[in-house]
Amino acid sequence: MKSFLNKNKNSKKIIILDDNDFSKYQQRYDLQNQNIEIVSSPLQNIRSQQINDGVQMSGSIQSDLSSSDNFTSSGGFGGGGNSSSNTSNRNSDNSTQRPLMVDIGLEYKYRLALEQNPNDFKALVKWGSLIYKNIKNQMGGKHVDVCLMDWNEELIPIPQNNNNHHNHNHHNNHTSGNFTGNINSNTTLSNSFFETLNSFNLREPLFDVCGKYQSSLQLSGGSNLLNIPFSTLLNYNLNEQLNILVNNLNNSSPSSSSSSIKTKNTTSTTTTTTTTKNLNDISNNINNSRVLRSVSLPPAPPPPPTEDPNSPWSDPILWMKWGDCLFLLCTYLELPMYRATCEKYFKCIQILFKQQEKQHQQQQQQQQNQQDKEKFEKQNNYNIKLLAIVLRKWGITLSRYSRRMKSQFLMSEWTSDENIQVEELWKVLHSQSIQSLLISNKISPSLVTQYHLATAYHRHAITLNQFGCQSKEEIYGLITNSCKIYYETLLESLSDTFLQQLQLQQQQQPWHDIEYYNNNEIFNDQFKSKSLENWGRALDVQLSTKLNDEEETIEKEEEDLNSVDEYLTTFSKSVLKGVTPSLEGVVSLCLNSKQALQYKAINSVSVLCRSSEIVKSPIYNELMDQMTKVESFVSKRDDAESLLSQQKTLKSMPPKLQAYVRMSGLGEEEIMRNFEIAWNSIYFLTKDTIPNQPIPPNYYRSNKKNKLKQRQLNDSNNQDEKEEPEEIKPPLLPSIHRTNQLNNNNNNNNNINNNNINNNNINNNKNGNSGGETPSPSSSFVITPFTSNSQSKFNTQRQFLSNSTLFNLSSSGIFTNNNNNNNGGSTITTTTTNNISPTKTNGWTLTLPSKAPTRRATVSLININDLINQQQQNQINSVSTLSQNNIILNNNNNLDNKPISKYIPNSIIRTTVNPPLLSRCDETIFSSGTPLPLFRDKIKLGTGAFGNVFYAIRKSDSSPVAIKVLMERTKKDSPIIPELYIHSACNHSNIVTYIESYLCKGHVWIILEYCDGGTVRDLLQATCTPGNPNNLQLFEETLIAYIITELLEGLVYLRSKGIIHRDLKSRNILLTRKGKVKIADFGLATTCSLGRGRTRMCGTMGRIAPEVIRREPYDTQSDIYSLGCLIIEMAEGTVPYGKDSSLKALFYTAIHQYKLPNPKKYTKEFVDFLYLCLNPDPFKRPTPEMLLHHTFLSGADRGKSILLGRFKNQDTRKNLLLDNFVAF
C-alpha cells in the first residue's frame, strides 16, 4: 500500500491508494523510476501554498490549479475576475513547482467526487484543467501559448530546446537584470514534448481533456452553447463589437477612458498609452467591405438563451483552454477539427465582449469611489489584453482553416443544410483571419502578432497560386503585403533600440503578466530566423509571379529589385546580430533566373562570407558550403543554357558580320569557349560599320527600352500632379572597393613623392572627434542604395537610411574599401556631411564581393564599431607621420608574405589612396570672347577621332601653345565634356598643362601647353615621313626606363585624383626638347572617385586591358596594362598581337597573357617589369607606386641623356611643321 499527504482548506487527511491504482498512476505520469515514499517532513516542503477547494466557478478552478494555469485570476490572464486573493497567487508564483504527488491526489479526488455524484460537472472541469496543465508542462511550461508554437506551415518539425525555466527560479527572470538573457532565448517546445508528439503519447490526454469539457458542458445544460452555425462565424462583424467597446469607453469616466491599450507611435520607438480616440481610429481604419465578402449564406439563427453567469462556461479562459487542445490536435496531430477550434475561440471572444459591456453597465448604475474606479480600470485593461490574445488565436486558426478547406481536407465537416460553396467560403475565412489579426495588433501591438499577420497573407497567396488563381495581380498584391510586413517586423526587431524598448515594455507589465510576456510576446531569435525563412519563400513567389499588363510589369521589376535589396540587407544584419537564419531564401535568390537579381544575391552573400564578424558564427561553415555549391551549379547551368543560344546567335548574325568573323582567323571552337568576350569584341569593332546586328546582352549596363517606357510613364503621371519643391538630397556616393584592415606598422617605409595628394582627411577626423569644424562636402561619403530618380513609392529604404538613427554614420568617418581592380590595400577614412548625426557610430563597409570582379559594386553593412574606435585612435597617434602623405599603408593583400617581384623591395607594399571628388564645371569654365584674334601663326599638327590639333603663337606673350579644336558632341545641348573638367583639374609636371578653353561657332577650343619634342611615336619613326612607317628606330632599355619613370610619376598623380586615362599610347605621350615626358589627350578619360568600377569598353586597339574587354569593372589599374603595351611598342616596334587582326588581338588579349617572342635579348629586369604590367589579373598587377621602386628603373638617368642626344641638332620636327602649314 502507498500513502501520501494532502492538505485541504479545512482538514488534513491521508489518502490511501490501492497498489493497482498506484501502478496505474505511475504508468500514466511516467514515474516508474521514481521512488515514492511516505512523507514525514513538514507540510510546507510538499507544497508551500494552500489548495483551496471553493465552490465558486473560477475560484474553484484557480484554487486547485493556481500554480499551473496559463493565467492568474486577479488581473492577470485568468478566469473572469472571481478569484480569492492576490496574495495567494503571488505566493504561488514565487513558489517552486509543486510535487507530482499533489496532482495525483487531485486526480484521485476528482475521480472520487464523480463516483459519488456523476453529475458533478465542476469536478469534470477541474479534472480536465488538471490534465491540460500537465500537457502544458510537457510542452515547455504553463506560460507557453500553443498557438505561437505554430510556425505557420502545414506540418514542420517542432524545434527542440531544453527549456527548464519553468521548473526553477522562474520568478527571478522577472527582474530587469535578467531580461536581456531572456530576449535571445528560444522559447520552444522541450525534447520530451517533441518525443511524445512523435509517438502520439499526447493524443490520448488531449482527447481526454476535450471529452471531459464536452461532458461537463452537457451536464451543466449548456450544450446549446455549441450550436453555433457556420454562417455566424463567417458573418461575425468584429468592427461592430469594436464600435460598441469604443462607445462604452467614450461614455465612461475620464480615468477609465484612458485605457492602457498599447499602440505603435509613428514618431517614437517607445510604447505609450492611448485614449479612446485611438480606438476610434482603429474602427475607422478597418474596412469591413474589403474584409468580409458577399457569400450566399443562410440567415443567422436566433441567439441561444442567456448563459448562467455562475456556470463554469461563462469563463472565457475555459473556452480558450478547450480551443488550445483542439488546436494541437489540428496542427500537430493532423486531425480535422478546425471548425470546432474556431467555435471555441469564437465563444471566448463573445464572452469577453459581453463581460466588457456588462462591466460598463454596472459602472454607470453604481456610484463608484476611487478604489472601485481603479478596480474597474484594472479589469478593463485585463479584458482588452485577453481579447487581443484570443483574437490572435482565432486569426491563426481561421487562416489555417482557410487553406485546409481549399485543399479539401475538411469536406467531411460540411452538412447538406448549410449548402455553402467552398470556393467562396475559404476566401471569407481568410478575410476574417486578416481582420482578427489586424484588430489584435491594433489594440495590443506585438511583433509576434505582426509576424502571424504576414504569414496569413503569405499562406493565402500560396493557396491561390497553388490552385490556379486566374488573377495574378491578386496573388502579387497579397504576397507583396506579406513581404512588406515581414520587412517591417524584422527591421524593428533588429534595431539598436529594440532591447531598450523591450525592457520598457516589461517594466510596464503587471507582475502577474511578466512570465507570459517573456515567453510569448518577445520576438526572439527563433522568430527572426523563421521570419527570414518565410520571407524568402514569399519573395520567391513574388519574383516568379508574372503580370499581364506591360506598364505594371515595368513597375514590378523595379519593386522586385528593391525587395531583394531589402531582403539581402536584412539577412546580413540578422547574421551580424547573431541570428542563425535558414539559407533557403538567399540560395534561391542566388539561383534566380534573372541575372541582375542573381548577381546581387551572390555579391551580397560573398561580402558576408568575407566578413570577419561571422567567422565564429555557427552559420559560417554552412554559408561557405552553400556558396561553393551555388557557384558550381550556376556555372554549369549557364554553360548548358548558353551553348545553344551562342550557336544560334552566331548563325543569325548578318552575312557581312559572319564574313568578318571568318576573316579574323578565329575558329568557331575558340569563339564558343569564350563567346561573351568574342561577341563583345565583335560588336565593339563593327558597331559603326555593320548595321542591324544584335547587341550583346551585357554590353550596356541598363535596359534602355524599359527605362524609356518608365520615363514616359512617369511623365504622364506627373502631368496631373502639382509640382512639388525639390528635396535636398545628400550626394550619392557608393563604395570604394577593397576591404582591408588598418596597419600603421609600415608607414615609414613609403618614400613616394605624393605631396599633391590632399591630406585633410586626418585633420577632419581629428576635428570630428573633438567637436571641431564640420568637414567639407567634398570629402564626405553618404551611402544610399538607390538613385535619386527612383519613384517615391520605392524610396522607403533610402528615406529610412537618411532619417533613421539606426544608420547614422560616425562623425569621425566611415570606412570604405576597394575590392575592384583598385590597387590593393588599406582602409581609408573620410568624414561625414552635416546631414549625418554624429551621435552614433555604425560602420558601413563597402566592397565588391569576390576576387573575380563583377559588374556592379555591392553595398554591405558590417558592424565594425570596435575596429573603428581602435583605428581612429591609431590614426590620431600617428598624425605627425601621416600628415606628409595621405596614403595609408597596409600589407593585407600580402598575407602570404610573398613579394610581388624579387626586383621590388619587400618593404614596398600596396597602397590605397583617397581620391577627392572632382567638381563638375559649368559654362563658366569657358573664357569670354572669340579666340581667333588671340593667336597667330596657326599650323595644323594632326587630326584625331574627334577633332584637330593646331600649333599657334599666343599674341599676348608670344609663347607657343597647342590648340585642340573639338566638335560639340555633348548631351542636352551642353558644351561641357569630361575632358574639360578632368584635364582642368590636373596640375602636374608630367601632364600637359591645361591653360584655358573657348566656345566658338559650335566648336570647343582647348588651349594647352605646347610640347616641342613631338610624340613618342614620332621619335620611333626614324625619318618622320608618313610614307615609311616601318622604318623605326627602337629604344634602348635605359631610354624606355626613363620614359616609363616619367609616365609613372604622372600615373601616380592621376591615381591620387581617381582619374583613368583609358587611352595611354605612343601618340598621346608628348616630349619636350628639355627631356620632359607628358601625358596628353584626356578625351576618353573618366573618374573612379565615385567608388565604383567603370565598365565602358573604349580605347585604342592593342592597348586595351583584359578586364575592359571582359566587361568587368576596372579602374586606374587598366592604365598600367596600357603602359605595358607602350613598353612593347617602344621595344618591339608593335603592340601586343599587332600582326593579328583586330578581332583576334582583342580576343587573345582577354583570354591569354602576352609573351615576348624573344625574351632572351632583354635583361631579366626588363622582362619582369613588362610581365608585371601585362598581368591579366588586375588584382595582382602592381600599382604605379610599387613599379617606381622596381630595379629596372634604376638606369633612368642614363636614359634621359640618350633622349637629349636624340633631340640635339634635330630640326626635323620644325621643318615638318612648316611644310604642313595650314591657315585657319
UniProtKB/Swiss-Prot annotation:
Reaction catalyzed: L-seryl-[protein] + ATP = O-phospho-L-seryl-[protein] + ADP + H(+); L-threonyl-[protein] + ATP = O-phospho-L-threonyl-[protein] + ADP + H(+)
Compositionally biased residues, Low complexity: 58-74, 83-95, 743-768
Keyword Coiled coil in annotation: yes
Tree of life domain: Eukaryota
InterPro entries for this protein: Kinase-like_dom_sf (IPR011009), Prot_kinase_dom (IPR000719), Protein_kinase_ATP_BS (IPR017441), Ser/Thr_kinase_AS (IPR008271), STE20/SPS1-PAK (IPR050629)
SUPFAM superfamilies: Protein kinase-like (PK-like)
Annotated region (Disordered), positions in chain: 57-98, 252-284, 693-784, 815-836
E.C. no: 2.7.11.1
Residues annotated as domain Protein kinase: 935-1193
Transmembrane segments: none
GO BP, sorted A to Z: intracellular signal transduction
Molecular function GO terms recorded: ATP binding; metal ion binding; protein serine kinase activity; protein serine/threonine kinase activity
Residues forming coiled coils: 352-381, 540-569
Any one Pfam family match given in the protein's UniProt record, by short name: Pkinase
Gene3D superfamilies named among the record's database cross-references: Transferase(Phosphotransferase) domain 1
Biased composition range(s): Polar residues: 772-784
Residues reported to bind ATP: 941-949, 964
PANTHER family: SERINE_THREONINE-PROTEIN KINASE DDB_G0292350-RELATED, STERILE20-LIKE KINASE, ISOFORM B-RELATED
UniProt record similarity statement: Belongs to the protein kinase superfamily. Ser/Thr protein kinase family.
Name of the protein this chain belongs to: Probable serine/threonine-protein kinase DDB_G0292350
